[in-house]
């Protein structure tokens, strides 16, 4: 019978191989789009600044077509380069787009002077200026910047120009993080990250863009595979650049931490709390299939190479293989563990309609039981004596018992946890009431809200009246879903 299991493992491996791994796919079957990209042949600080503003205006213009917006955005991200044509060549390795380079020799009264090699007529150059002047209506001050008049300020030197350009590029890169996931809820996180870069001195306050301009840029990124391929090449280049050697790629490397593995949170949380915790629950036969699936997915991730962390940004179809519905029971167990062990999961909406309540409860109980357990491997490495181990376990148990007397301030996330915003104690009372009296009319929505509420209440310090030597695990949220048959996404 061992051959049957070997064949099954090989079948799983074949099913999870990367798309296109064997080659022979269709090439050249899609019509190629001509994308005009601007380059500047001058190193004059004022010309560079005018070039960056010109590209920014076209990238957010309401009259520009999609290829023109895409090319202007690529040009804007290359405006810091010494030789822009070489930088643009990195974006030219496309299967669905052909980049047409339009060279600009300089600017006269903010009007671009195109090189004769570009073949841009005077009429077309004037049309570019008209397009650049058509900004979104929300830009009431006639400029993409919140501060009026900054476009007309001549830079002092090349350093001033680069600081201005980097301020714009940083805001463009910030929009990439949620361009392919939760783009409609990106305003809060974008503002927070821009404020961070302002504190670090990477973004100057007077060069902050209107939110509508950032939204237009994000929409261009979302709709253009050519732009996203260029962005991924820049991200990989930033990771391969030594830290501290390039101001621009230091910024790209910092933004990379927000973009890497976007859309794969469930997969990595399952690995962290379902596999890496090495609990005895992994020996359950009902988890064998999910563990085998995780093994194949880890192999698939490695086979994707450098593009693996950017599957979502590239729109890679292999990303769907990493959806939590593919390993629902192990995912449920891991989220139960994470609900107790990691307060950072509070803002992650882990509840799914395919989650198994029994495995979620199992994860909660294992996490509570492991609160004062000793990692034998680490204890052996630290050479802890038996007395030291007993003392450590006793201290951990004592801290766990005394948490009820410590008031730890926490920020309530009512939308994400299903709780009200009336304060910690009011939220706890509301959640207890909901748990005790579930509304039969709410159905599945009530189950998801209660699961979030219970997970949040376990991370908060319980009331002193609830503090006991052996705290009881929280009640199971909602009706049992052990026999659910809906395993869709």
From Swiss-Prot:
Keywords: Capsid protein, Helical capsid protein, Host cytoplasm, Ribonucleoprotein, RNA-binding, Viral nucleoprotein, Virion
Gene (name only): N
Biological function: Forms the helical nucleocapsid (NC) in a ratio of 1 N per 6 ribonucleotides, protecting the genome from nucleases. The encapsidated genomic RNA serves as template for transcription and replication; encapsidation by N is coupled to RNA synthesis. Forms the encapsidation complex with the phosphoprotein protein P. Before encapsidation, the newly synthesized free N protein, so-called N0, is chaperoned by P.
Residue ranges with Polar residues bias: 428-437
Region (Ncore): 1-402
GO molecular function per UniProt: RNA binding; structural molecule activity
Protein family per UniProt: Belongs to the paramyxoviruses nucleocapsid family.
InterPro entries assigned: Paramyx_ncap (IPR002021)
Quaternary structure annotation from Swiss-Prot or TrEMBL: Homomultimer; forms the nucleocapsid. Binds to the viral genomic RNA. N0 interacts with the phosphoprotein (via N-terminus); this interaction allows P to chaperon N0 to avoid N polymerization before encapsidation. Interacts as N-RNA template with the phosphoprotein (via C-terminus); this interaction positions the polymerase on the template.
Location(s), subcellular: Virion; Host cytoplasm
Entry's Gene Ontology cellular component terms: helical viral capsid; host cell cytoplasm; ribonucleoprotein complex; viral nucleocapsid
One protein family per Pfam: Paramyxo_ncap
Region Disordered, residue ranges: 401-489
Name recorded for this polypeptide: Nucleoprotein
Domain notes: Ncore is globular and carries the regions required for self-assembly and RNA-binding. Ntail is an intrinsically disordered monomeric domain in the C-terminus.
Region described as P protein-binding: spans on this chain: 1-375
Binding site for RNA: 178, 193, 258, 348, 352
Annotated region described as Ntail, given as residue ranges: 401-489, 403-489
């Amino acid at each position: 019978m061992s051959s049957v299991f070997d064949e099954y493992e090989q079948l799983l491996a074949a099913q999870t191989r990367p798309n296109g791994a064997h080659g022979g796919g269709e090439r050249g079957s899609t019509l190629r789009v001509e994308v005009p990209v601007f380059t500047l042949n001058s190193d004059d600080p004022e010309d560079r600044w005018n070039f960056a503003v010109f590209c920014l205006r076209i990238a957010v213009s309401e009259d520009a077509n999609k290829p023109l917006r895409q090319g202007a955005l690529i040009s804007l991200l290359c405006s810091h380069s010494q030789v822009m044509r070489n930088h643009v060549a990195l974006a030219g390795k496309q299967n669905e787009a052909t980049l047409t380079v339009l060279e600009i020799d300089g600017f006269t009264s903010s009007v671009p002077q195109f090189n004769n090699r570009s073949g841009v007529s005077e009429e077309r150059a004037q049309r570019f200026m008209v397009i650049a002047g058509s900004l979104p209506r929300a830009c009431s001050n006639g400029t993409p910047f919140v501060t009026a008049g900054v476009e007309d300020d001549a830079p002092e030197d090349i350093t001033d120009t680069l600081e201005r350009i980097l301020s714009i590029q940083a805001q463009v890169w910030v929009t990439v993080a949620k361009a392919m996931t939760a783009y409609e809820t990106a305003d809060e996180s974008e503002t927070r990250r821009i404020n961070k870069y302002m504190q670090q001195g990477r973004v100057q306050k007077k060069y902050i863009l209107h939110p509508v301009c950032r939204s237009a840029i994000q929409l261009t990124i979302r709709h253009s595979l050519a732009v996203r391929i260029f962005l991924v090449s820049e991200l990989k280049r930033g990771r391969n650049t030594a830290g501290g050697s390039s101001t621009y790629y230091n910024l790209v490397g910092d933004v990379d931490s927000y973009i890497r593995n976007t859309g794969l949170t469930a997969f990595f949380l399952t690995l962290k709390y379902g596999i890496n915790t090495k609990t005895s629950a992994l020996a359950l036969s009902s988890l064998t299939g999910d563990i085998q699936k995780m093994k194949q997915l880890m192999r698939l991730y490695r086979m994707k190479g450098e593009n693996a962390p950017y599957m979502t940004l590239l729109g890679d179809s292999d990303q769907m293989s990493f959806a939590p519905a593919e390993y629902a029971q192990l995912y449920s167990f891991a989220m139960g563990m994470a609900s107790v062990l990691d307060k950072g999961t509070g803002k992650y909406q882990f509840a799914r309609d395919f989650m198994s309540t029994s495995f979620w409860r199992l994860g909660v109980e294992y996490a509570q039981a492991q609160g004062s357990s000793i990692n034998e491997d680490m204890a052996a490495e630290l050479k802890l004596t038996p007395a030291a181990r007993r003392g450590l376990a006793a201290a951990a148990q004592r801290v766990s018992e005394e948490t009820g007397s410590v008031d730890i301030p926490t920020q309530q996330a009512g939308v994400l946890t299903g709780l009200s915003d009336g304060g910690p104690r009011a939220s706890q009372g509301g959640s207890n009431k909901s748990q005790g009296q579930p509304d039969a009319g709410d159905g599945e929505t009530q189950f998801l809200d209660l699961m979030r509420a219970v997970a949040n209440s376990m991370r908060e310090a319980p009331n002193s009246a609830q503090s006991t030597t052996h705290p009881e695990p929280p009640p199971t949220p909602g009706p049992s879903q052990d026999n659910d048959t809906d395993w869709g996404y």
